[in-house]
Amino acid sequence: MLLACGAVLGGAGCNNAVVVQLMTGNQTFEVTTSSVEIPAQLQAEGTIASVPCPTGMCPSTDTLPLACVSGVCDPEPRTIAVPVGDVVDFDVLLREASTILRFVDAIEVTRVQYAASPNSLNVDVPDIEVFWGPDTAAGIDAPGVFRLGVIPALPAGTAREGDMQIDADGSAALSDHVVGGNRRVRFFARTSIDLDPGDPIPMGGATVTVNLTVRAIGRILE
């Protein structure tokens, strides 16, 4: 949708300068407990057992690292990192918006709406970081991946929606990437599950969607 036309490019007039608003549509990912396996020796009637470690050592497990904290074996946080949705192509978004914008001089992520529903997790999930990277990126640790923002923590079993906190540096890097000619990007999410003795054995999952609103500034064909 064409939003404005004016001298937004340092002297350019309405004949060749336009501002358009684009939306990526919902990009979806799952936060699940499937990767968190609790060894039998750490289970006690549906909860994380309190296993003493008087010598400062905890049982060795292949599935869940443990640390001796205050004399009790405490599971270390388990990181969860997943892809978010599909590759987003800004050229396609421009075409679908039926704009006449052909040369992009800057973009700005103005809003990222999120929704977490349904949420069947029986444990709280801390803040969820959302990242963007080139379409060739295989994960968060790949070159050219930047943090785009943070979704607030999700309480167990609670559906949530709202606006993600946007990282200004990550948004600026996304603008440089798109202006540089690579219009295809993908997204990733990262959070963790941190369990304490006495917590329930983790189960369930949450479906989370993010939808970016982007302001694109550019020019029409000259």
Locations of the language-model features?
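N-terminal Sec signal peptide cleavage junction
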Residues: 5, 12-14
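N-terminal leader/pro-regions and domain N-caps
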Residues: 14-75
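Short beta-strands within extracellular/lumenal beta-sheet-rich domains
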Residues: 75-104
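A short beta-strand element within beta-rich, extracytoplasmic domains
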Residues: 103-120
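Extended, low-complexity, turn-rich repeat/linker tracts enriched in Gly/Pro/Ser/Thr and Asp/Glu
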Residues: 115-126, 195-199
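Short, surface-exposed beta-strand/strand-loop-strand elements in extracellular ectodomains
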Residues: 121-139
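Cysteine-clustered segments with highest specificity for TGF-beta superfamily mature ligands
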Residues: 152-211
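Short, low-complexity, Pro/Ser/Thr/Gly-rich segments in the mature regions of secreted, periplasmic
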Residues: 209-222
